[in-house]
Amino acid sequence: MGDQVLGAHFLEDALKLFRDYKKLAEGAFAQVDDHDLFRAIDDESNTIAVNMKHMAGNMLSRWTDFLTSDGEKANRERDMEFVMLPETTRADMVEFWERGWRCLFAAVEPLTADDLMRIVKIRGQDHTVVQAINRQIAHYAYHVGQIVYLAKHFKSSRWQTLSVPKNRSAEFNKFLEEKVKSGTSAAAGRFDVGQEFAAKNRK
């Protein structure tokens, strides 16, 4: 396998991961009402809205002029990403969330295999493009996990699972095996098959 093929595969998979985590977070925060979107479980915890705000702020800093400027922008106010103004609405948060993701995809989608070993800086430290992308995938997965956990906590028994339901692994494996045999699983997102199985069993 040549470097070009490997590089193209990496970028394709990275974009897929970004889209999958975006969709997972949205499936979680769509289930909570406005009160729970802005509610913290204790004084040290972030709310769902704060996680959204921080992720979007990070994206706007990291991915604006990705190849040509430091990923930690001088005009970024990181500490304010963890402060929620009283007048902030769900619509405000969703708009900012989408703005961050648009910035990310605008930066990553044009990349080619030839870009992957280029050097970019984050807080003055050198990263290859591969390292910078992997760093952000890990960071966003961390915060998406918090969003899912909080939404699940608030919804409790009314939570509609976004993965394989508890005590249904054997059934899910059979369901997935049948999808693989039929050739319909390959195009699904990383979390889509589990959600499809859960939805099928709610009917």
Spans of features found by a protein language model:
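Extreme N-terminal tail/first-helix region
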Residues: 1-16
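Short amphipathic alpha-helical segments with heptad-repeat character
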Residues: 12-15, 19, 91-94, 98, ...
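Short, contiguous alpha-helical
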Residues: 15-19, 26, 34-81, 122-185, ...
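Hydrophobic alpha-helical core bundles mediating ligand binding, dimerization, or RNAP-core interactions
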Residues: 18, 22, 29, 97, ...
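Acidic-glycine-rich active-site phosphate/pyrophosphate-binding loop
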Residues: 30, 114-121
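Helix-adjacent hinge/juxtasegments
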Residues: 65, 70-107
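Long, charge-rich low-complexity segments
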Residues: 99-116, 183-203
